[in-house]
Structure formats: C-alpha cells, structure tokens
Amino acid sequence: MEKELFRTIIAESQEYIGRIHLVQRPLYLEEYGNYVFVGVRQAGKSYLLYQRIQQLLTNGVDIEDIVYVNFDDERLQGMSVADFDFILQAYHSMYEGQPIFFFDEIQNVEGWANFARRLANQKYRVYITGSNAKMLSRDIETVLGGRYLDISVFSYSFSEYLKAVEVLLSKNWQYGRKANELQRHFRTYFDWGGFPELVHFQEKRIWLNSLYNRIFFNDLVVRHKIKNEDALRLCVRRLAESVKQPCSLNRLSNLIKATGTPCSPSTVMEYVRYLQESCLLISIDNYVSKFVEKETIKKHYFVDNGLLHLFINNPNTSLLENLCAITLYKKYAKGLYYYNKNIEVDFYVPDEGLAVQASYQMSDGETIEREVKALVALHGLHPLKRAMIITYEDEGEIVRDGLRIEIKPAWKWVLEGL
C-alpha cells in the first residue's frame, strides 16, 4: 500500500462528496464526539457519513479538512493495520491543519480499533461505519477506551421512505385522499422494506436477493470460514419461518436435521450469533424466562421486512409482527421483551408499561378475544400504562376490566412515532 494511492482517494472523495443528493435523516451528534455507526449492509450508513460531512461544510468547515476513505474500495484489498499511517502521511503531504476522518466499512482491516484509538488520543475527530455488530462488543469498547459513541443504523423508517419517494405529510394526513395515498405506499414498504437504494428499483426481489447473497457470503461464510453452507442457509430459512414464535436452539437443530443436513444445537447457536453480528437478525428475550432459557429460547426477527419476505410464502402476518419488532427495537433496544408464561404477549416494554400485540386482521371474535384476553391478563400481573393491538388496517378501541386497548393500523402507528 502506498501513500500516493491515499492521496488519490482523498482528492477523489473531496471532489464529489459535497454534491451527493441525500434524503435527510435524523442525525443529532455532539460537535466534538467520535462515532461508530453500525448496521446491516446497505442500511444507509455511508449516507449518514455524507450527511455529516455536508452538515460540517454548511457550518463552515473547508472541504480540504475532510478525509473520507471507503475500505470496500477494491484498491484497498489486502490492506493491513500497518498501512493506516499512510492515510495520515498522505493528508499531511497535501494540506496543513487537523483533518476530520470518515472511515467507511473500516472493519475490513484487521486491527482497525487500535488505529481508531490512536486518532482519538491525538484529538482527531473520527466517524466510522461498519456492518458487524462486534464493533459494538465489549472487546472493541475496551480497545477504543470509551472514546467513541455508537449508533445503530437501520434501513428507512416509513416516514423516511416517504421522503425518499417525495411524498409529503400534509396537516390532516390521516384522512381522505392523503390517507389513501399513504396506504398505497405503505403496502410497498410493508412488503419490501426500506433499504435506501431499493426505493427506486422496480425489480425489488432481485435487488434484495443480491444484497442477501453478499451478506451471506461476505459477512457469514467468508468471515467465519463456514464449511457447511447448506446448514447455514437452512438455519436462515427456518428462522424466517419461525418469526412469530419463540424458537429454541434444539428446535432449530431438529428442523435442519429433518432435511438430512447434520447440524447440532451448538452449531446453531454459532450461526445465530453470526447472523446477529452481521446485523441481519434482531433477537428478544422472554421477560419471564430463567437465565438459561433466555440464552437458548428467543424470538428472532429480521432487520428489514424485505429480507424476511425473501424466505416466506403468505407473509402478511409474519411481516406485520416483524415490522412491529423493528419499530419497537429501534426505540427500546434491550428494553424490549416478549411475554410467554401461561399468557402470550408479542411485545412487552416493562420500563414503559407498554404491551403490544400484532394481529393482521381483527375480523373475527375469536382473534379479538385472544389478543384482548392476553393483554388484560398481563395487566393483572404487571399494570400497564398502554396496551395496543397493531393491525394492518383495522382501527378502534376496546375497554376491558379497566384496561383501555388501542387498535391501530400499522401505517398510522409507525407515522405517529409509537
């Protein structure tokens, strides 16, 4: 790796990065903080770096003070930790002053955290992205020495999706023609998710298949040196098919072995951990489980509805619950649970006194009674401040045994910010 290559990369990025058209996303950062943005591939991490760069340029920072390096650049293949110093040398051979660094997919270079810590120690401002949740692990935090703040990045919310397709929310968006327009767009978002680059693609399944294959091979098979690709593929598919129910490691192992592919519970545990590290999977615990059960029996959801849709037929009920999981996880993260002990409640946030059921349709009395009965029972054990049933389009309210239960269509719920 040579210094001249980094001079070229720095100059190239300075030419185009300020002109990139962006859908503005919520981004509230401390002026002198250093940040690590982590999320699944194509969630929009690079665009958040561009957005931050454009904010700085608007606030008077000179473009010459910006150093952006994307480590997915094929010219940087084979880069080692010893080559990082060439970035500093290249910049200081071009300009004077103290640059602000933006490093995209830096986890591609082994040992990156030591370099990032050195920059922070030397009072550089640094913004980093990566597609591996291990970047948020205690090991990395220890190496970084608490010098970086982490931000999880997800694909577009529905409101961000609407910005991307240039649909504005008018004053009374819940009613009339505007409501009909929003529901049409929600159907596409509900089915195919919110990856920024996907928004304007017509062949959405093809795009999503391509993304999944990159995640599968680059972030799973290659990174973790997996030899039994068939078992891993089956594990992903069985997780997708089990999205609405608690799933034990033993059950997953048996489902895979039933196809004739050997796969032990310990191997399944490794696969699930890899899927979590690749930011493909969200996992939540049963609030009332014992410690061992918390580790072995969880509910698993996909980080975007489009990825889940690749694996299931008749997907409506699974997609609705998956969307609820994503929406709640973004806000509550590790404070989000499900409840399963004599009663079944899809989502429970004990710190907020919030319980949420996902039910695609409320068209029959049996469904209504099941969902309401579970919420009332939970309220009897742990008094709730808010109880909700999220549907695809049904709306209303039920009061039972002193508990007010809101019935909300998902498209309204996600736009109202919970």
Predicted stretch roles:
Residues E2-S13, D139-P246:
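Interdomain motor-coupling "hinge/lid" segment immediately C-terminal to the ATP-binding subdomain
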Residues Q14-Y32:
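Pre-Walker A adenine-sensing motif
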Residues F37:
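Hydrophobic anchor at the beta1->P-loop junction of P-loop NTPases
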Residues K45-S46:
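Conserved lysine of the Walker
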Residues D65, H200-A355, Y360:
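Accessory nucleic acid-recognition modules appended to NTPase machines
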Residues V67-G97:
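Short glycine-rich substrate-engagement loop in P-loop NTPases that contacts/grips substrate
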Residues R125-S131, S152:
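Structural recognition of the conserved hydrophobic beta-strand(s) that form the central parallel beta-sheet
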Residues E393-L418:
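Domain-level recognition of nuclease-like catalytic cores that cleave nucleotide substrates
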